[in-house]
Amino acid sequence: MNSKLKSIYLGQAIGDALGLATEFMSKEEITIHYPNGIKDYNDIYQDEHRSRWSKGSWTDDTDQFLCIDRSIKKYGHISTLDIAQEFKNWFNDNPMGIGKTTYEILKLPRKKIFHIRNLLIIY
C-alpha cells in the first residue's frame, strides 16, 4: 500500500475514533464536556454511548468504509450490488454502533433491499 493510500486509511480510522467523542452531542454538550478541546482518546467523555468502545476504537463509519474498500479492491470499480452485499455481511456479524436507518434497511431480506435500490434508480 502506498503512503498516500495508507494516510487515507489511517485518517479515516483515527478521525472516526476521535469523532466518537462528540457523536450525537449538541454544541452545548460539547462545550460542557470538552472546554479545552480533545487532544487524545483519554479526553473522551465516557457516557453510556461512548463507553461501549475501547479507547481508540473506530465506529461503524470506518467499518462501512472498509466494506466499500473491499468491494472496490475485489472488482476494480464501484459495484453497488457488491457494496450492498458487503454491508449485509458486516451487518450479519452484529456490528456495534450501527445507526437506526442503516439497521432498518440491512435487517430487511436481501430481495427487499434490492427492490428498494431498483426503485431509487428508476425514480
Describe these PLM feature segments.
Residues 1-123:
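Structured, active/binding-site neighborhoods that engage oxygen-rich ligands
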